Curated annotation (Swiss-Prot):
CDD domains: prolactin_like
Species whose genome carries this gene: Rattus norvegicus
Glycosylated residue positions: N41, N175
UniProt similarity note: Belongs to the somatotropin/prolactin family.
Name listed for the protein in its UniProt record: Prolactin-4A1
Length: 227
C-alpha cells in the first residue's frame, strides 16, 4: 500500500510539473511574440484582432444580404452570370485561398487588406444613394447599404490600429485602378444599370471575403504561431 501511494504521489508530481512547464512556456512564448511585435499588452493586441475580424464578418453579412437582394429582384433570368468582367481591384495581386496567402509576408498581407478596403471607399459612398435613386430600394435595404459603408470605414480604422500597435508599415497610397462604374449605375438603360449593381456586388463579395480570410490567417500566425 505504501508503494502504491508513493507511486500515485509521484505521478501527480510529474503531471503538475508538466502543466506548470507548459503554462510557463506559453507565457514566455506570448511575451516573446509581444516583444517581437513591439506591443506591451499581448492580450489587448489579440482583442484588437478579434474586433477587426468581427467587423469584417458583419460586413460580409451585409454584402451577402444585399447581393442576394440584387440577384433575386434585378438579375434573375438576365444571364448576368455568363458575362465576363474585370473588377477595379484586379490590379492588386490578391491571393485567393489560404495556401496562396500563406506565401505572403505578414506586413504585405495586412497592407493588401488595407488596400482592398480603401479601393471600395468611393464605390460604397455612392452605392446606398444609387440603390435609393436607381433601384427604389426600401429603408431596410438602404440601411444595410449604409451600414456596409460604415463597416468598411471602421475596418480600415481597425487595420490602421493593428498596424500601429504591431509596428507594421502600411502603404496608404496603393496602386489600383480607380473605380469608374458610377455612370453605369446611373444608366437610363435598365439592363446596363442592373448589371452594374450585380457586378459591383460580385467584385465586392470576392474582395471582402478575401479580407476576412487574410485577417484570420494573420491573427493565427501572429497570436497562435501555428495555423
Amino acid at each position: 500500500m505504501h508503494l502504491s501511494l508513493s507511486h500515485q504521489w509521484s505521478s501527480w508530481t510529474v503531471l503538475l510539473l508538466l502543466v506548470s512547464n507548459l503554462l510557463l512556456w506559453e507565457n514566455t512564448a506570448s511575451a516573446m511574440r509581444a516583444k517581437l511585435l513591439n506591443v506591451h499588452n499581448y492580450t489587448s493586441y489579440g482583442d484588437t484582432w478579434n474586433q477587426a475580424i468581427k467587423i469584417s464578418q458583419d460586413m460580409n453579412q451585409y454584402i451577402s444580404d444585399l447581393s442576394t437582394h440584387v440577384k433575386i429582384f434585378y438579375a434573375q433570368g438576365r444571364g448576368f452570370e455568363r458575362r465576363t468582367t474585370r473588377c477595379h481591384t484586379s490590379s492588386l495581386s490578391s491571393p485567393e485561398n489560404k495556401e496562396q496567402a500563406q506565401q505572403f509576408q505578414l506586413e504585405v498581407l495586412l497592407g493588401l487588406s488595407h488596400s482592398l478596403l480603401q479601393a471600395w471607399l468611393n464605390p460604397l459612398h455612392h452605392l446606398w444613394a444609387e440603390m435609393c435613386d436607381r433601384l427604389g430600394s426600401t429603408p431596410p435595404t438602404l440601411y444595410k447599404a449604409l451600414m456596409l459603408k460604415e463597416s468598411n470605414i471602421k475596418l480600415l480604422d481597425a487595420i490602421k490600429n493593428i498596424a500601429k500597435k504591431g509596428n507594421f508599415e502600411i502603404n496608404e497610397k496603393a496602386n489600383y485602378t480607380a473605380w469608374s462604374e458610377l455612370g453605369f449605375l446611373q444608366s437610363p438603360n435598365r439592363d446596363t444599370r442592373y448589371f452594374a449593381f450585380y457586378n459591383l456586388f460580385h467584385c465586392l463579395k470576392k474582395d471582402s471575403n478575401n479580407v476576412e480570410m487574410y485577417l484570420k490567417l494573420l491573427k493565427c500566425r501572429l497570436i497562435r504561431s501555428k495555423c
